[in-house]
Amino acid sequence: MVDPVAALCNYNVLEVIFSYLELDDLSHCSQVCKSWNLFLNDENSDVWRWHCLNKLPKEALKSDLLSSVSTYKTKLRAYFHAWSPNDCSRNVYIKPNGFTLHRNPVAQSTDAARGKIGFRHGRHAWEVIWEGPLGTVAVIGISTKEAVLQCHGYVALLGSDDQSWGWNLVENHLLHNGDMQGSYPLLNNAPKYQVGERIRIILDCDDNTLSFEKNYEFLGVAFRGLPDKKLYPTVSAVYGNTEVSMVYLGTPMDG
C-alpha cells in the first residue's frame, strides 16, 4: 500500500524539479515512466502554470485572446506556434503580446506573415482574428517557406503563386497560383467577414486538404490535393495599422 504522505512528498518534489526544467526536457521526462507521464498529462498542474506565467507575456494572459485554449499547457503551446517575427514582411511587426501582428502604414505595399511552426503530418487548427480594417484585400490561409511575403502594390499576395493557398475575406474568393479558384463558402449571398469574427484555419495533412470555420461553423473544404510539404499558417494584408491575431488550437475537434 502506498503511503499517502510519501506520495504527496513525491508529487511536491516532482513539481519543484519540473518547474526548473526546459520544455524540451519536460517532453523527455514524460517518456521516462508511467507516473511521470501521468503527472505531466495534467495540463493545469502547477508545473504548466509556472512555465505559462513565466514565458507568456502578461498582456496575452490578461486578455480574452486565449479563451479558446483553456489549459496552461495549451496556452503555452499556442505561444510557441504564434506569428514569427523572423518570417514576415519588413513592414510587419509582432506586438508585445506575442500573438498579434501589426502592419505599418506603408503605401503601395502588400505584406504577409507566417507562423513559427509548420506541419507536414497530422491535423491542425489555428484561430485567426482580424482586429483592424480589411482594406481592399485581406487573405488568410497557408503557405510553404518559399512563398513571398512582400510585394509592390495592393494585391492578393497569399495565393499569388504555387506556394500559397488563400481565402480573400473581402471578396469571398479562393486563390492559388495567381488564379481565382472559385467563390467560398459555397452559399448563396454568403455573408462577408466582419472585423472581430473568429476564423479557424483547418489543415489536414493526412487528407491533403485546407478548410475554414467561421464563428464555429464549418464552411467546407476550400482546397484539395495539397503538396507533401511543410505548410504554415499565413496572412497577407494591405491596410495600414491593421492587426491580425492567431492562436494555435492543436488537433481540430470533429463535429
Curated annotation (Swiss-Prot):
CDD domains: SPRY_Fbox. It comes from the Eukaryota. The keyword Signal does not apply. Residues 61-253 form the B30.2/SPRY domain. Residues 3-51 form the F-box domain. Pathway: Protein modification; protein ubiquitination. GO terms for biological process: negative regulation of gene expression; negative regulation of synaptic assembly at neuromuscular junction; neuromuscular synaptic transmission; positive regulation of protein catabolic process; proteasome-mediated ubiquitin-dependent protein catabolic process; protein ubiquitination; synapse assembly involved in innervation. Belongs to the FBXO45/Fsn family. Required in the presynaptic motoneuron to down-regulate the levels of wnd and restrain synaptic terminal growth at the neuromuscular junction (NMJ). PANTHER family: F-BOX_SPRY DOMAIN-CONTAINING PROTEIN 1, SPRY DOMAIN CONTAINING SOCS BOX PROTEIN. This is F-box/SPRY domain-containing protein 1.
